[in-house]
Amino acid sequence: QNNHLWRGMEVSDGIVLLTDLSYTMANDHVTVGLWGGCNSEGSYKEFNHYLNLKAGGWGFALWDTYNFSPGATYNNKEYWNYSAHTTGRFLDATLSYRFQEEKFPLLLSWSTVVFGRDRNSDNTKQKYSTFAYAEYPIYQKDGWKVDAGVGGAFALNRAGEDAHFFGTTAGIVHVSLQATHDLKLGNYTVPVYAKGMWNPQSNQSYFQIGAEIIRF
C-alpha cells in the first residue's frame, strides 16, 4: 500500500509492506499472531504481537505494539522494556460488537491504550487514551464492498491536559470511506482497496490504495 493509516493518523508514507503471521484455534474463537510493517525508505519499522478472541458478534483484541522507526522521539531501542515510565511500546485493548442482523451489520468498537507510551507530560500518570469507532457497510454486491466509518478520541484520565494519544483534544479524529474489490487474475483472487480518510481535528486528509498480494 502507499501509506499506513491508523485511527486518523498517517503512521508512515511511502510504499508500505505489511505482514501478518497468525494461528487460529478453539473453533475459530481464538487467534494469536505477529504483525509487522516497514516502508521502502526504511523510515518506518513496526513489530507487534496480538491476541484476538471472538464469539458471535463480540470480539476482543489485545495488541502489544512496538514502532521502532529510526526517527521516533520515544525509546525505540529496547524491545523488551516493559517499564511504564520508559517503554517505547503500548498495549491497546479493543472490545467490539458486530450486529448480526443481515439488514443492519453495524460495527461498534471501543479501544483504550491501557499501558505504555500514553503518559502525561510529567510522565507520572497513564492517560488511557480511548478511540470509539462505528463502521457500516453501505454497499456490498458482485465482489464489491464499501464501508463508511467515523471515530472519536479522548483520554479517560486527562491528567490535567487536553491532549491524548490520538489528538490535541477530545473530538472526532477519523472519518473514512473504503471500497474493496476481489480482483480476479486467472485462477487467483487479489483483494484490492482504495480508502479516503479525513481527520477534522488536525485538518488533514489522506488517500490510500493497497492490495493483498500473498496469503497462505
List PLM regions with ranges.
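Outer-membrane beta-barrel proteins
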Residues: 5-9, 21, 37-39, 50, ...
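Short glycine/proline- and aromatic-enriched beta-strand/turn motifs that initiate or cap beta-hairpins
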Residues: 1-39
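Outer-membrane beta-barrel transmembrane domain signature
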Residues: 25, 99-193, 197-202, 207-216
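Transmembrane beta-strand segments of Gram-negative outer membrane beta-barrel proteins
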Residues: 1, 53, 192-194
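Structured domain cores in non-transmembrane regions
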Residues: 70-71, 84, 88, 98-106
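Surface-exposed loop and membrane-interface regions of Gram-negative outer-membrane beta-barrel proteins
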Residues: 27-83
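Short, surface-exposed loop/turn motifs at beta-strand boundaries within globular domains
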Residues: 12-14, 44, 127
